[in-house]
């Protein structure tokens, strides 16, 4: 009995072996729907292989250390340099050597719902995770660059066990630990990518909580960035304790209020 096209599509959906004997039979099936289904399956397989290869390549920096006997390598990243409000948050993540969640990459390349799923997986599988944050008042006092460094340092210090080497996204920290600063590291290292996801999800949750404390600025949606609704909130309600007064739009709002 000839298989229906729907049945073949269903079987292809769960097929991962390109040498499966059924493929030979299906490729000889002259029905257009079957050939389209096989072409789509081949495309999906090629994309999955590329995704796996890219993921494997993003472990190159970690693997260099592992091969030298350096087992505990932490990826470090921060989020929240650009917003007008809220803290800068950093995460440090040590991944196990057999970690194989290929979707882990720079948090900016991952949709929110997917980030939250990956966050839970990383929490479950990581050897260790450390978090650090620096509030708006301190950002104003020491500048955002130094605040990011301070948050990263705090995150690293909160790791247990402590790392033997660090892979850091575009930063050096003042710690006596072997470290590499990688430009766009969150897209080049799985450990840094994992750290960026953890930091992003945690900071977004913090800003959602702040939205309840300080309504009218749309913090739950803009995460403190200078959107139209956020700027309108500043114009109407003034600045909050979590606003960064050294950042231009906020500083201007304070000056304008004093001059009125």
UniProtKB/Swiss-Prot annotation:
EC number: 3.1.26.4
Annotated GO MF terms: manganese ion binding; RNA binding; RNA-DNA hybrid ribonuclease activity
UniProt KW keywords: Cytoplasm, Endonuclease, Hydrolase, Manganese, Metal-binding, Nuclease
Family matches, as Pfam families: RNase_HII
Chief subcellular location: cytoplasm
Compartments in which it is found: Cytoplasm
Cofactor: Mn(2+); Mg(2+)
Function: Endonuclease that specifically degrades the RNA of RNA-DNA hybrids.
Family statement drawn from the similarity comment of this UniProt entry: Belongs to the RNase HII family.
Protein name in UniProt: Ribonuclease HII
Source species: Leuconostoc citreum (strain KM20)
């Amino acid at each position: 009995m000839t298989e229906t096209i729907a049945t073949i599509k269903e079987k292809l959906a769960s097929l991962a072996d390109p040498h499966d004997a059924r493929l030979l039979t299906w490729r000889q099936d002259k029905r257009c729907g079957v050939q389209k289904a096989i072409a789509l399956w081949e495309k999906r397989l090629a994309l999955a292989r590329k995704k796996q290869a890219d993921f494997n390549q993003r472990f190159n920096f970690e693997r260099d250390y592992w091969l030298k006997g350096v087992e505990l390598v932490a990826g470090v990243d921060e989020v929240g340099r650009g917003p007008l409000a809220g803290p800068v948050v950093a995460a440090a993540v040590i991944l196990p050597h057999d970690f194989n969640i290929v979707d882990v990459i720079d948090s900016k390349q991952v949709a929110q719902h997917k980030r939250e799923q990956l966050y839970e997986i990383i929490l479950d599988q990581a050897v260790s995770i450390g978090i650090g944050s620096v509030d708006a008042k301190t950002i104003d006092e020491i500048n955002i660059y130094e605040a990011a460094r301070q948050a990263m340092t705090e995150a690293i210090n909160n790791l247990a066990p402590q790392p033997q080497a660090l892979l850091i996204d575009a930063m050096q920290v003042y710690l006596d630990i072997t470290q590499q600063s990688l430009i766009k590291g969150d897209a080049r290292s799985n450990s840094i990518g994992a750290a960026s996801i953890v930091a992003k999800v945690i900071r977004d949750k913090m800003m959602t909580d702040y939205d309840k404390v300080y309504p009218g600025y749309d913090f739950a949606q803009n995460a403190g960035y200078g959107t139209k609704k956020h700027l309108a909130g500043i114009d109407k309600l003034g600045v909050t304790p979590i606003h960064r007064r050294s950042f231009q739009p906020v500083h201007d709002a304070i000056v304008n209020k004093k001059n009125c």
